[in-house]
Amino acid sequence: MAPRRARGCRTLGLPALLLLLLLRPPATRGITCPPPMSVEHADIWVKSYSLYSRERYICNSGFKRKAGTSSLTECVLNKATNVAHWTTPSLKCIRDPALVHQRPAPPSTVTTAGVTPQPESLSPSGKEPAASSPSSNNTAATTAAIVPGSQLMPSKSPSTGTTEISSHESSHGTPSQTTAKNWELTASASHQPPGVYPQGHSDTTVAISTSTVLLCGLSAVSLLACYLKSRQTPPLASVEMEAMEALPVTWGTSSRDEDLENCSHHL
């Protein structure tokens, strides 16, 4: 009877042992992998650090995966040390040959030689603007004509070079009297930052103010000369009037003397 009871206990204990083994929590629960290793010219976005999770590396922009290499890595457990780690990927990222051939070439500098801009004339009929000065390879001419009764009319080219200003004045009251003054100003302003005026701008203002002062001075001198002439004219007129008044008196006295002589002869 005793051996039969022992065999029955063993038969009942085996399923219970299997059940306990199945219900026992696994030893690997809660184990996670550290951050994966870095690969040159590639990035990785890890979605899960748990065991047996798989992730893939992605090559950066301008690079592509080399043929024969793999971007796959997996979180595995080292049973000897009971430590989880990522498998080493064989990925190698190389430059994309298609993008290398499509790289744009640097812009080349083109220099145009012997170009002389033609200034446009907006002056009234009968007035000739000043001629533009010759330009070199890297400089251009800026011509401005100042005509009495009109505004400043500049003719500008892409780069600042020589500036010429001519002022022509004509007098309609007196015949053939023309006063012309020319100023030539040279200013080297090849590269001027925006918002900064070149040196020729201030020189032009000085030249215009100088011409205005000279014209005012000439006008004052002419007015003074006319005033002096007008003051000298009345005395001459008075002398002529006195001479004219003296002539009849002399003629009257001479005729009286002749009459007296004739009367004396008759007597």
Swiss-Prot record:
**GO MF annotations in UniProt:** cytokine receptor activity; interleukin-15 receptor activity; protein kinase binding
Q: In which tissues is it expressed?
A: Expressed in neutrophils (at protein level). Expressed in fetal brain with higher expression in the hippocampus and cerebellum than in cortex and thalamus. Higher levels of soluble sIL-15RA form in comparison with membrane-bound forms is present in all brain structures. Isoforms 1, 3, 4, 5, 6, 7, 8 and 9: Widely expressed.
What is the membrane topology here?
A: Single-pass type I membrane protein
Those parts of the protein on the Cytoplasmic side are 229-267
- The segments labelled Disordered in the record are 102-178
Q: Describe PTMs of this protein.
A: N-glycosylated and O-glycosylated.
Q: Which cysteines are joined by disulfide bonds?
A: 33-75, 59-93
Write out the annotated subcellular location: Membrane; Nucleus membrane; Cell surface
Please list the residue ranges that the record places on the Extracellular side of the membrane.
Answer: 31-205
| Subunit field text | The interleukin-15 receptor IL15R is a heterotrimer of IL15RA, IL2RB and IL2RG. IL15RA also self-associates. Interacts with SYK.
PANTHER family the UniProt entry points to: INTERLEUKIN-15 RECEPTOR SUBUNIT ALPHA
Protein name in UniProt: Interleukin-15 receptor subunit alpha
Q: What organism does the record attribute this protein to?
A: Homo sapiens
- What gene name does this entry carry? IL15RA
